[in-house]
Amino acid sequence: MRIVNSRYILIIGLVAFLIVGFFSYLLWFLVENSGKVQDEVPEFAGGKTCIGCHPKEYSLWKESDHANAMLIASDSSVKGDFNNAELTFNGKTSRFYKRGNKFYVFTQGEGGIQKEYRIAYTFGIRPLQQYLVPFENGRYQCLPIAWDTRNNKWFNMAAMVYSPSDLQPDNWLYWTNQSQNWNSMCAECHSTNLHKNFDPVAKTYNATWQDINVNCEACHGPGSSHIKWAGLPVDERP
């Protein structure tokens, strides 16, 4: 009996020693490598960092829908006719024009009042291009009138999307209301590493992004670790 008990005690002691040893090593490993793990968390670097190693892919991307998902309104990005073009819908006429290098629309807006709005960004490219208008408190709203890039003409989206098409200013779907708010309804899919930065108390937005459009990292993930890896000599790459 004493021999058997001694064996049990020896086995239990050995198991306890192994368990304590394992967890001691695990604790040491975590403490020793905690800083390294933190340093290796990849960060967004921006789509332009891809050009050096992937010029062909970047060139193809530049012509894609992703690259044109959202851009600053300019002569190169705007496809619509802003040469004093007009569109009449439900008895209301909207006019599109330029002053200098800025794009404007005179249309029915808040409270149903006709007034001038500045176009800040293009939104998409085909089969239609929409336009974003800046408002107070960091808001951007999607203009309901879009440019048909296949037939080269203006059209009001309400004619095809909404019923009734004659939306009133108190309707949630009206273009200056929440339904057409870029910050909360559209932004995350059209820009890369976007942060809305909404202040619920002040009811303001302060949106930030890595790239204004959908860059390589939007699908492939943050690129800093890959860039670091690509910068190593070939025989040193893990």
Per-region residue spans from a language model:
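Extended surface/linker regions that mediate inter-domain or inter-protein docking
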Residues: 99-238
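Hydrophobic cores of alpha-helical transmembrane segments in multi-pass integral membrane proteins
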Residues: 17-23, 54
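Soluble catalytic regions of membrane-associated enzymes that act on cell-envelope
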Residues: 87
